[in-house]
């Protein structure tokens, strides 16, 4: 069995001809994007970073790929339980052969080929959800439908970029509304917001800072534009770009302009840059910076790796504050400092990134015998 590529037109026919009973669509995008807008009847495959890291592009258990027990049992039946096709999609990839090894779509495809030796054919949707939803919005569902009156008004508009505005009834949550003001000269939004010239003109935006994998040419001819390519991955190094981004924002501010910082969804990478800017220039603590931005753009959710880098950045640029009750032992402190700090944050902030493996939270056992301690007369920890 092999993976076959298909376009949106063919998927649309399959959904109509086969109905949902004969075609299973597996959406490998993050749950936030899936919950906001998805192919009708599709299932979300939400593989966490630990599973992806261990898989390294290889196969994982079917229970990770198909969390829905009924769907899993049916597909694993002899002959696929009557299912003729399993379609895998991500946000916008055009070729499954070029998928990154650590991508969820790559792991899902490999796993399906391993567990479905016979039965349903495995397909990959070219162009991903972005292309399909722009072509066939009637085959998709959105969590936040917009009133018919507003929809009819939007349909009659043309953007200043010369392209028709897509039906906003199927726009993901992170693209709803417009860019938000973080500071009088600093705005935060998504790639969609950055592509809409009317948004930029209304807010008097003079510069764009793109922190995503792909550069953009839309509406950039008359704007000061900077592109910092960063993956939205817990292993990506974003902190090395903090100063570069801060310098660019300050340059725009000094010239009396306004800058829109964006990535793909305006959820992880660009909010991380904005938090770093607040921490550096306003001396905000990480908790303060996160809550400040969360109040203005509720969908922000930096990944766990970015939060760790922001925490490290805080320790480098801001004076340390004494903790009221330090850990009782140095070994305990070494294993729990980072997690303990995050657990003191607000509930919203704790839920904003991936769940850390619970094994890290467990105390580290000490197997070696403890020799007599020769304590310094100057600094003696009485709690150990």
From Swiss-Prot:
Coiled coil location: none
Principal subcellular localization: nucleus
Residues at the catalytic site: 263
Subcellular location: Nucleus
Short name of one Pfam family: Rhodanese
EC number of this enzyme: 3.1.3.16, 3.1.3.48
Entry GO CC: cytoplasm; nucleus
SUPFAM superfamilies: (Phosphotyrosine protein) phosphatases II (SSF52799), Rhodanese/Cell cycle control phosphatase (SSF52821)
Motif, Nuclear localization signal: chain positions: 53-74
GO molecular-function terms, A-Z: MAP kinase tyrosine/serine/threonine phosphatase activity; phosphatase activity; phosphoprotein phosphatase activity; protein serine/threonine phosphatase activity; protein tyrosine phosphatase activity; protein tyrosine/serine/threonine phosphatase activity
Domain Rhodanese: 19-141
Family, as annotated: Belongs to the protein-tyrosine phosphatase family. Non-receptor class dual specificity subfamily.
Function statement: Dual specificity protein phosphatase; active with phosphotyrosine, phosphoserine and phosphothreonine residues. The highest relative activity is toward ERK1.
Protein name per its UniProtKB record: Dual specificity protein phosphatase 5
């Amino acid at each position: 069995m092999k993976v076959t590529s298909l376009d949106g037109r063919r998927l649309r026919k399959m959904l109509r001809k086969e109905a949902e009973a004969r075609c299973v669509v597996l959406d490998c995008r993050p749950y936030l994007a899936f919950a906001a807008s998805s192919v009708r009847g599709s299932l979300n495959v939400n593989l966490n970073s630990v599973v992806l890291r261990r898989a390294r592009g290889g196969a994982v258990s079917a229970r990770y790929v198909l969390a829905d027990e009924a769907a899993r049992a049916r597909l694993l039946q002899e002959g696929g339980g009557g299912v003729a096709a399993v379609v895998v999609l991500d946000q916008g990839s055009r070729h499954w052969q070029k998928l990154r090894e650590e991508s969820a779509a790559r792991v899902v495809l490999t796993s399906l080929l391993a567990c479905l030796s016979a039965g349903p054919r495995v397909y990959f949707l070219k162009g991903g959800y972005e292309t399909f939803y722009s072509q066939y919005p009637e085959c998709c569902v959105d969590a936040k439908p917009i009133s018919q009156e507003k929809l009819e008004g939007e349909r009659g508009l043309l953007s200043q970029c010369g392209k028709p505005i897509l039906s906003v009834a199927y726009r993901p949550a992170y693209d709803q509304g417009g860019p938000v003001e973080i500071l009088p000269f600093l705005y935060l939004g998504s790639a969609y917001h950055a592509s809409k010239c009317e948004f930029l003109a209304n807010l008097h935006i003079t510069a764009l800072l793109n922190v995503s994998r792909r550069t953009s040419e839309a509406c950039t001819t008359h704007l000061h534009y900077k592109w910092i390519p960063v993956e939205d991955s817990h292993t990506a190094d974003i902190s090395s770009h903090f100063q570069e981004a801060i310098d660019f924002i300050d340059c725009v501010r000094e010239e009396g302009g306004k800058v829109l910082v964006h990535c793909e969804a305006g959820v992880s990478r660009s909010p991380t840059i904005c938090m770093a800017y607040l921490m550096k220039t306003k001396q905000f603590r990480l908790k303060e910076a996160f809550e400040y931005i969360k109040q203005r753009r509720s969908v922000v959710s930096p990944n766990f790796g970015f939060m760790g880098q922001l925490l490290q950045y805080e320790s480098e640029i801001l004076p340390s504050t004494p903790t009221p009750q330090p850990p009782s032992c140095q070994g305990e402190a070494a294993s729990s400092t980072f997690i303990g700090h995050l657990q003191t944050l607000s509930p919203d902030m704790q839920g904003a990134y991936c769940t850390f493996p619970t094994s890290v939270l467990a105390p580290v056992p000490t197997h070696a015998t403890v020799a007599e301690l020769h304590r310094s007369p100057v600094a003696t920890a009485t709690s150990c």
